[in-house]
């Protein structure tokens, strides 16, 4: 067993230091950098943190559905955090279900989940070259989201990518905040770690490996610290019986210097190196560090400036060191979060992972009497949050998130004289002051499909329910126009709310572009563009290819207007909601 352990460790070390680091060094000679995903399914022979740590850049991966991403992105972000890498990429939205049916609103919550886990550099998967403009939607495969010029919503994809850029930028600022470092052990091959005991809600963690502990980790101000500045409050050892003496000696030094370490004692060395003396060293060190612990009872052992914690769950351990949750909210809420910190500023990313509106209080562990702001990555707006209060160790802020909405809660402005500001509510009541009833003049982009260039709708409907099959199966761009009279009698910001659109839209008001919508709350701020009296609104909507592909399944092949290399849509499939569905309202907040 020791020989096998040494061979496996040798393989992992050589893959990391000869293959990855070797390729990195050669690349640098030619002005290049290496980028890799630090895992591999169906036969990964390395240790994921060490393997990724030797590369210049690191990446994870997730699909728009399913399980892929459950371990890959934490593997990448932990590697990036402990090895001091600013950008942590992810091959994103790798597959999106059936061809040409997915659109950015369906991708958002999944992407936000992994932003909260530490991803901060989005790599879109994928863009396939299209050799022809006539064969649409064109070349595709069974995998991959169709981020290419022949997709119907490509002209409005900037609404989505601007969002991704804003989130990426914010999450690249400062350093990641995590309270716990879970040691993954020294065994190989290894593609992920375990969080045992489990971390309570409101805390973040990273995995950490022996290389970084032994070489880089030190104690500063009672915190486990890495050279690039990231700090942890507790180092958790895995439930294993083995550890090399060299590593256990470093753990001992960390504790005596003031660190908090938690876990069970090792019994012997896993390696054949210096056997049997190494086992005796382990027994001697373990006896010193776990002084008389019986293996079951809770025990706190004081060693130098630090402590060894035994027989505890994570909540008990965190309570012992008076470590409050980094963020606290109702545990039943479907919210994920991440936290970055730079000098004088705390940046929290929060995401509603549900399809429901959420109104809740959140307690943030911030110091120095900082005032909160909400930075909206969808539209770039900044909202002062006037309504907040002091808690034990932080600030409580009433918050509101629309379905699948995300936001940055930024603390950067210090309050004078420690006075809490009480003014307007954070989220004033939204009041509808006008409904745009039409009629609506609607233009279709593609007249080659037998559509009239313009039709008039007395009222908005889901086009997939239109009695005209050509309209019902339409895919592409269409423009809605109407006039309306408005006189403003309210105080507050005015919004044009589309409420329900299939699937994305850009809006012009009085010939001025005022923004686009692709996710909740599907509204744009028109305060600076709406006038008293007559107004003209023009809304450019894009659908997906799904309905046209289904419609063509009713046609003989020679009569079809679409061509896709991989197309499994049939007559039996349901149509997707399409067009401007509404109701369209003017709201004041």
Regions found by a protein language model. Name each.
Residues 1-477, 485-489, 587:
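Carbohydrate-binding surfaces of carbohydrate-active enzymes
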Residues 387-389, 514-518:
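Short beta-strand segments within Ig-like beta-sandwich modules, predominantly Fibronectin type-III
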Residues 396-399, 523-528:
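Exposed aromatic-hydrophobic patches
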Residues 406-407, 494, 532-552:
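Short, well-structured beta-strand segments enriched in hydrophobic/aromatic residues
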Residues 415-438, 543-586:
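Glycine/proline-rich low-complexity spacer/linker segments in large multi-domain proteins
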Residues 460, 466, 500, 517, ...:
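Beta-strand/loop-rich accessory regions of lumenal/periplasmic or secreted enzymes
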Residues 484-510, 518, 537-541:
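Aromatic-lined ligand-binding clefts that engage carbohydrates, nucleic acids, or primary amines
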């Amino acid at each position: 067993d020791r020989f096998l352990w040494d061979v496996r460790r040798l393989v992992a070390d050589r893959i990391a230091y000869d293959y990855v680091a070797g390729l990195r060094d050669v690349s640098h000679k030619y002005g290049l950098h290496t980028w890799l995903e630090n895992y591999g399914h169906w036969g990964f022979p390395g240790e994921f943190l060490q393997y990724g740590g030797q590369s210049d850049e690191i990446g994870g991966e997730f699909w728009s559905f399913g399980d892929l991403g459950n371990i890959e992105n934490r593997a990448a972000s932990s590697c990036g955090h402990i090895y001091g890498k600013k950008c942590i990429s992810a091959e994103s939205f790798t597959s999106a279900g059936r061809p040409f049916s997915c659109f950015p609103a369906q991708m958002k919550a999944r992407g936000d989940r992994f932003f909260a886990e530490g991803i901060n550099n989005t790599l879109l998967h994928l863009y396939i070259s299209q050799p022809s403009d006539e064969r649409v939607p064109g070349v595709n495969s069974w995998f991959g989201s169709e981020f290419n010029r022949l997709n119907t919503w490509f002209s409005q994809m900037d609404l989505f990518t601007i969002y991704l850029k804003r989130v990426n930028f914010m999450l690249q600022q400062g350093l990641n905040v995590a309270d716990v470092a879970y040691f993954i052990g020294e065994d190989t091959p290894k593609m992920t770690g375990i969080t045992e005991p489990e971390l309570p809600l409101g805390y973040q963690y990273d995995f950490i490996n022996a290389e970084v502990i032994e070489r880089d980790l030190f104690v500063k101000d009672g915190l486990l610290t890495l050279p690039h500045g990231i700090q942890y409050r507790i180092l958790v050892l895995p439930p294993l019986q083995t550890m090399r003496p060299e590593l256990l000696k470093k753990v001992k030094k960390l504790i005596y210097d003031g660190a908090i370490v938690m876990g069970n004692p090792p019994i012997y060395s896993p390696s054949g190196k210096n056997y049997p003396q190494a086992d005796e060293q382990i027994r001697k060190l373990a006896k010193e560090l776990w002084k008389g612990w019986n293996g079951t009872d809770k025990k706190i052992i004081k060693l130098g400036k630090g402590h060894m914690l035994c027989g505890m769950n994570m909540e008990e351990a965190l309570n012992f060191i008076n470590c409050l949750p980094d963020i606290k909210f109702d545990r039943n809420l479907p919210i994920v979060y991440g936290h970055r910190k730079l000098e004088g500023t705390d940046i929290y990313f929060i995401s509603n992972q549900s399809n429901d509106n959420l109104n809740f209080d959140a307690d943030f562990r911030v110091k120095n009497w900082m005032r909160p702001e909400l930075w909206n990555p969808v539209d770039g707006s900044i909202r002062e949050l006037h309504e907040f209060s002091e808690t034990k160790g932080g600030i409580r802020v009433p918050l509101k998130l629309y379905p699948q909405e995300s936001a940055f809660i930024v603390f950067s402005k210090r309050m004078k004289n420690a006075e809490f500001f009480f003014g307007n509510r954070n989220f004033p009541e939204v009041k509808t002051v006008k409904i745009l009833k039409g009629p609506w003049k609607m233009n279709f982009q593609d007249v080659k499909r037998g559509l009239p260039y313009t039709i008039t709708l007395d009222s908005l409907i889901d086009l997939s329910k239109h009695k005209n099959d050509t309209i019902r199966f339409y895919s592409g761009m269409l423009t809605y126009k109407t006039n309306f009279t408005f006189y403003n009698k309210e105080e507050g910001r005015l919004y044009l709310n589309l409420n329900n659109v299939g699937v994305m839209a850009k809006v012009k008001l009085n010939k001025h572009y005022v923004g686009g919508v692709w996710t909740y709350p599907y509204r744009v701020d028109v305060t600076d563009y709406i006038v008293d009296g007559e107004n003209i609104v023009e809304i450019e909507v894009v659908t997906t290819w799904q309905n046209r592909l289904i419609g063509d399944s009713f046609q003989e092949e020679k009569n079809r207007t679409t061509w896709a290399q991989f197309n499994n849509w049939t007559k039996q499939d349901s149509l997707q909601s399409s067009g401007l569905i509404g109701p369209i309202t003017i709201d004041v907040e």
